[in-house]
Amino acid sequence: MSQPPPPPPPLPPPPPPPEAPQTPSSLASAAASGGLLKRRDRRILSGSCPDPKCQARLFFPASGSVSIECTECGQRHEQQQLLGVEEVTDPDVVLHNLLRNALLGVTGAPKKNTELVKVMGLSNYHCKLLSPILARYGMDKQTGRAKLLRDMNQGELFDCALLGDRAFLIEPEHVNTVGYGKDRSGSLLYLHDTLEDIKRANKSQECLIPVHVDGDGHCLVHAVSRALVGRELFWHALRENLKQHFQQHLARYQALFHDFIDAAEWEDIINECDPLFVPPEGVPLGLRNIHIFGLANVLHRPIILLDSLSGMRSSGDYSATFLPGLIPAEKCTGKDGHLNKPICIAWSSSGRNHYIPLVGIKGAALPKLPMNLLPKAWGVPQDLIKKYIKLEEDGGCVIGGDRSLQDKYLLRLVAAMEEVFMDKHGIHPSLVADVHQYFYRRTGVIGVQPEEVTAAAKKAVMDNRLHKCLLCGALSELHVPPEWLAPGGKLYNLAKSTHGQLRTDKNYSFPLNNLVCSYDSVKDVLVPDYGMSNLTACNWCHGTSVRKVRGDGSIVYLDGDRTNSRSTGGKCGCGFKHFWDGKEYDNLPEAFPITLEWGGRVVRETVYWFQYESDSSLNSNVYDVAMKLVTKHFPGEFGSEILVQKVVHTILHQTAKKNPDDYTPVNIDGAHAQRVGDVQGQESESQLPTKIILTGQKTKTLHKEELNMSKTERTIQQNITEQASVMQKRKTEKLKQEQKGQPRTVSPSTIRDGPSSAPATPTKAPYSPTTSKEKKIRITTNDGRQSMVTLKSSTTFFELQESIAREFNIPPYLQCIRYGFPPKELMPPQAGMEKEPVPLQHGDRITIEILKSKAEGGQSAAAHSAHTVKQEDIAVTGKLSSKELQEQAEKEMYSLCLLATLMGEDVWSYAKGLPHMFQQGGVFYSIMKKTMGMADGKHCTFPHLPGKTFVYNASEDRLELCVDAAGHFPIGPDVEDLVKEAVSQVRAEATTRSRESSPSHGLLKLGSGGVVKKKSEQLHNVTAFQGKGHSLGTASGNPHLDPRARETSVVRKHNTGTDFSNSSTKTEPSVFTASSSNSELIRIAPGVVTMRDGRQLDPDLVEAQRKKLQEMVSSIQASMDRHLRDQSTEQSPSDLPQRKTEVVSSSAKSGSLQTGLPESFPLTGGTENLNTETTDGCVADALGAAFATRSKAQRGNSVEELEEMDSQDAEMTNTTEPMDHS
């Protein structure tokens, strides 16, 4: 019977219920504000999971949902409940955590279902696995170890009557935890009226709530177990107790219910109690009222079953009070002598096929059930209610009680049972739960018995097929379908086609499947060798830090891997220990080479040295290390003690440090892998909240407790951390010399065997304590310089400007200071507030934009700094593989595009406001560097910024916007205005210059930039070139070109994204054989060429133009000797370019210059800007010198090439572009 909807007002939705008003001062409450403010609030907040066993770091938008789901334990918490909520101001954290994990939809560990949500480290499925053991085992109070109950003289089976006075009270912070707190199956709606009546009887306080239990056919015993201890730990014992109880008291039950239950039914009733009972087909699975009555007698306490108000008023047995009528009342009391208080369960829907428990809330008043909701007794006389339930004066009763099982005891009990589970099954229950989560639930397989999952998990571990990701913690299985390995299968056929006849003495490797197989000739199948096979990537997050798992759930670590053990004294700053050679260390070792020479034999070995361990016994002992090395390579050698002493001396020399903070650990890939659930150390959390010390792409120091990153990002973090320490050491000349690799001298005072007590450097331990009087700020200029500045808490705006001026030699009036995310300008204080401190926090980053009127001294310093940073950047990024750099660039571009979309802007409009993206370390800078390399004047375009061409400026070490008609412009928010102003000015100049230089304004012009063509009709149909903008031919700056180079062929390759020019060292570049009909190349933009038919030109018109060009060239060749002789007397050398310009302009009307030439000519210059400084003024000299060296035969077959010159066509619409130069 369906329940009609409740009358208005409408009930609050289950997730989440209305809570107390939030305080405006809280960051979390600010995040929950709605309306226009909510839409404009683009802040990103972070906080820690409040579960003490989890404490994962969570990131969420301020304008997002008011409840946050933990990515580690799966619980959902209100924002007010998160610990250490603070604003994240760094864009890198936002991109790599919010966008990558939430908006990008990157595959990660699957969302945890209700069975696997962990509270205090325990999930429902974990408890279900341990429940059968708890039915037979107890815990020895003295040893804390599990012991058989019969060995403790407590019988074979756990007596559930011992829980008769226990009651679970849920913690307020867990009320809304999915899978543990409030039930989400619809019971809140179905039981609304009933719960409202209970609420009114308890002074309008919500003190009795329905909580979740899994619907797996054991919901009644799950509900009772949760009502008793809060966990589903005792469902198995309750079923066995119930079955035993019915068997022992069957005669009394048959006599009591002979009018209602036939004698033949009792066998089925008892069988249904069995934990492994499987109902016949067509019979509904579940326990009935008679079983609830039996459980009340087992527990020696009443059980009250509630329903909706309409159900309770109906004539059906939908609600009842089940009394322990077969048990004497004096045995239904607790240790205090009072009657055991009833527990309460209810139906969750009108289908009445699922039980849920109703429990009280810890810290609130015990819930009271009013008299009008107390159902009638079931199966026994009504007057027994007063005998078994203590009624209040108003006729109601208290539910549950306050004798709860302590969490500490419960966890000890679980730990003891886990040991038994390991002994019985050879696998840890948490690993079985993970197998169920990742291999069954994710594929939609439900209803699989825990025994089957346990067996499957155990076999996977024994076969070495289980792997765990160190990043997201997900399990992955190396599994290959058996049919692939049999004849006709994918791998079988591949092996046979590659190797021919398969042999039993060979192994066959399949790298794409991460599999190594042997051949079984008897069965004619391939047999996987999982011991030699290794999974290379996580199936969920695709991270490469994947390790095999043992049966006890431990991970088979490799040297350098970060473990789950906390570290309090590590210099690396990650807060966790590292695995090395079977032990866990606070730090990674330092590595240095050593050479052993003995008996004419030379051996080179690497020594791994531990020196800063909090446990001094783990520090390396120089004599032990030396002895092991000598014994390893020269075992049993007589007199090797001398070699040992030599090795000791060498090691002491290598490990002696002048600076105690010199710590350069070995670089291990994945050693500082970012993981979900990492948190800051307790020392850091005990301080006042500080910003996360994560600065920009070039200088960021990633906090490992707060990020979930890919392999590329982790590697960059490690390398940039090293770079930051190097840059700090540049401040003194002495440390500069050490950085360049000068040999360190041994100082006896610095030789030590024990751990160092010196504190870690700030960059190595970004979370190290800083005094409240100082704050360190990372400053980056738009020309690539950077520095860490220490400010006092009282530093004002003008004092900050002075600090910047001292550090970077930038006058205050040229400083534009930006901070925050998105970057906003830090304005000078208003009148009367000059003494106010600047609103910067410890760890913030600010960017200095240097205004245009920058002094020469500042430019010189910038160039020097840019050069220095560039060299260090090469040293850092040189360690990364090209694949990793490509992956990093793709991820950052993807994040940038999504963030721009969220901001409501296109990518260019958003990116031009972030100039650092076009500077060293920025994403566009990195893409160009990775794709084509960096060379001064080299042009490129990006697919994400259509219609924009960029050029590399080596002096400033940045990319600039290239506008053919106007020049190069530094990227900034106002770059579009600068371009418009420059284009307008150039157009005006171009109009005048164009009309003066040629009386004919045809389709082709020859100016100082070469031949240009009007493209007003076709230009909008041309796709911009997206490859490299290399220089064409010889880009020599000398106007007197090599005569031999002029005889080489034209460099012509149709460019599809690769270099279409040869290097200047090649003397015979490849020739492009042009076809007059369809293979003509026309240059339409810097680095852009296209076919003639693509431009839709008339072939006849082009042929006519080609002939005119041939006539022009022939005329020039015939008159060249006379022209050179008369040059000095008839005209000045500077008149020659103008005269040739007029000739070409009046003769050549359209078409491509190179197809009209009888010979091939080398090309000079490259995709340079139209207003770049070329050798225009020396054209005459170049022509004179060049033609003077030619022989008469050469004059008949070739023409002098012209240098690149500027050209503007006043009649072109909006733009002009240079053609290839001849």
Swiss-Prot record:
The active site is at residues 216, 219, 354. Gene3D superfamilies: 3.90.70.80, Phosphatidylinositol 3-kinase Catalytic Subunit, Chain A, domain 1. Residues 1057-1074, 1143-1157, 1210-1222 have a biased composition (Polar residues). Keywords: Acetylation, Cytoplasm, DNA damage, DNA repair, Endoplasmic reticulum, Golgi apparatus, Hydrolase, Nucleus, Phosphoprotein, Protease, Thiol protease, Ubl conjugation pathway. Residues 1-21 have a biased composition (Pro residues). Residues 1041-1050 have a biased composition (Basic and acidic residues). The modification N6-acetyllysine is found at residue 408. Phosphorylated at Ser-1207 by ATM or ATR following induction of covalent DNA-protein cross-links (DPCs). Residues 208-361 form the OTU domain. The modification Phosphoserine is found at residues 747, 757, 768, 994, 998, 1077, 1198, 1207. GO terms for cellular component: cytoplasm; endoplasmic reticulum lumen; Golgi stack; nucleus. Residues 1200-1209 have a biased composition (Acidic residues). The keyword Cytoplasm applies. The modification Phosphothreonine is found at residue 763. Its EC number is 3.4.19.12. It is found in: Nucleus; Cytoplasm; Endoplasmic reticulum; Golgi apparatus, Golgi stack. It comes from the Eukaryota. Disulfide bonds: none annotated. One of its GO terms (molecular function) is cysteine-type deubiquitinase activity. Deubiquitinating enzyme involved in DNA repair and reassembly of the Golgi apparatus and the endoplasmic reticulum following mitosis. Necessary for VCP-mediated reassembly of Golgi stacks after mitosis. Plays a role in VCP-mediated formation of transitional endoplasmic reticulum (tER). Mediates dissociation of the ternary complex containing STX5A, NSFL1C and VCP. (Microbial infection) Regulates the duration of C.botulinum neurotoxin type A (BoNT/A) intoxication by catalyzing deubiquitination of Botulinum neurotoxin A light chain (LC), thereby preventing LC degradation by the proteasome, and accelerating botulinum neurotoxin intoxication in patients. PANTHER family: DEUBIQUITINATING PROTEIN VCIP135 (PTHR14843), DEUBIQUITINATING PROTEIN VCPIP1 (PTHR14843:SF2). This is Deubiquitinating protein VCPIP1.
